Amino acid sequence: MTTHSNKTIFQLDHAVFTYPYEEPVLRNISLTIQEGEKVCILGANGCGKSTLLKIFSGLLLPQQGTFAAFENEVTEKKLNDDSFSKAYHKKVGFIFQDSDVQLFCSTVEEEIAFGLLQQGLNRDTVTRRIDDIVKMLEIEHLINKAPFKLSGGEKKKVALASVLAMNPDVLILDEPTNGLDPRTQMWLIRLLDSLGEAGKTIISSTHNLDLVSRISDRAVLFDEDHSIVADEPTRALIQNAELLKAVNLVDESYRV
């Protein structure tokens, strides 16, 4: 198992987030993520998992409480600063639940190149990064295809390629196996395992208990009131059938 450093990657203190005209989707959330951890955010649909990941990804900020990344507080002013934003998104990669949201270029090659060019890398470096990542993910045959014509599994691989080409320290995945066939799910699980062994910090979300112990060492459980009710080793948490039933993650038929 990968050892964790004492370096704090993300820290939320008493964070609250509310979308317009709605009840809070995050209530008084305090949570710390250490470098090298593999953490899964667990909870029923609508509990606030995706919103939390978007805060970690620098796409949203809590309206109350504080959020720090890499031991520095993150503010709206900082995120609106171009140099800060570029540096942040070089360190933190986000894979949306729906790959179509982040695929918008005319070819797979252009899709992978986009973020690298935004970072100011020269064309030779970009080409080298693209070659390396398509070989790593075994998608060389897709390089000239249009992303919108790909299958769901292929789109997920291209979305991963566009993020991993940036070589982020932190990889965040929202419902990573959603819509994937069993073979692609296993491929993704093995990939996340190897990235974790390489020292990446990996944060994911799911409501799939068959998946969580395979992609995380630590699980953070939300209830339907949008609060954290448990934060402990994954294998211990998924043994707590009564708690999982109480948060509507499993039904009465669930057996440990």
Residue map of PLM features:
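A short, flexible loop at the N-terminus of ABC-type nucleotide-binding domains that lies
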Residues: H4-I9, F17-N28
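Helix-to-loop junction immediately C-terminal to a conserved catalytic motif
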Residues: S57
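Conserved ABC ATPase "signature" region
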Residues: D124-L142
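Conserved ABC ATPase signature
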Residues: A146-L150, E154
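Catalytic Walker B motif of ABC-type/P-loop ATPase nucleotide-binding domains
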Residues: L171-D174
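H-loop/switch region of ABC-family ATPase nucleotide-binding domains
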Residues: T206-H207
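Conserved beta-strand-loop-alpha-helix hinge in the C-terminal portion
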Residues: H226-N248
